[in-house]
Swiss-Prot record:
Gene Ontology molecular function terms on file: rRNA binding; structural constituent of ribosome
Quaternary state and interactors: Part of the 50S ribosomal subunit.
Similarity remark: Belongs to the universal ribosomal protein uL22 family.
GO biological process: translation
Organism: Mycobacteroides abscessus (strain ATCC 19977 / DSM 44196 / CCUG 20993 / CIP 104536 / JCM 13569 / NCTC 13031 / TMC 1543 / L948)
Protein role: This protein binds specifically to 23S rRNA; its binding is stimulated by other ribosomal proteins, e.g. L4, L17, and L20. It is important during the early stages of 50S assembly. It makes multiple contacts with different domains of the 23S rRNA in the assembled 50S subunit and ribosome.
Comp. bias regions, Low complexity: 127-146
Alphabetized Gene3D superfamilies for the sequence: Ribosomal protein L22/L17 (3.90.470.10)
Lineage top rank: taxon: Bacteria
Disordered: region residues: 114-156
Name of this chain's protein: Large ribosomal subunit protein uL22
Amino acid sequence: MTTTTEFPSATAKARFVRVSPTKARRVIDLVRGKSVNDAIDILRWAPQAASEPVAKVIASAAANAQNNDGLDPSTLVVSEIFADEGPTAKRIRPRAQGRAFRIRKRTSHITVVVESRPKQEKGGKAGASKASSRAARAQGSKAAAAKKTESKGGTS
């Protein structure tokens, strides 16, 4: 049996956004699980057109968390984000010899859930043990190199 910890969260939705859900998902996958500040920074420099509406929804969810629930904006993390398909507007493009091709103007419903998670301290015991093990390996390799040169010097 697994236990899940419930964190306080806030939601925002943008409906009928004039961007294809497939193209929105390309951008959404970049920011899932990131902090809100990191996600907005990533989207600010993303070249895709879908990054603008996704960034707006994330900013809206962060504002909802701060204003409605009183959560600290520095602890917010994008816990859930997804794009569903909205209605498709159909248009006709006239083609040669009386033909007509259909143009599908797709829309998306973008949903974002942000959670307030406590910040995890970096560089705790794990970082110290990693540095000490690296130092021990370096010391061992230096000793081995000195021993090797010593043995070469003694034989000649």
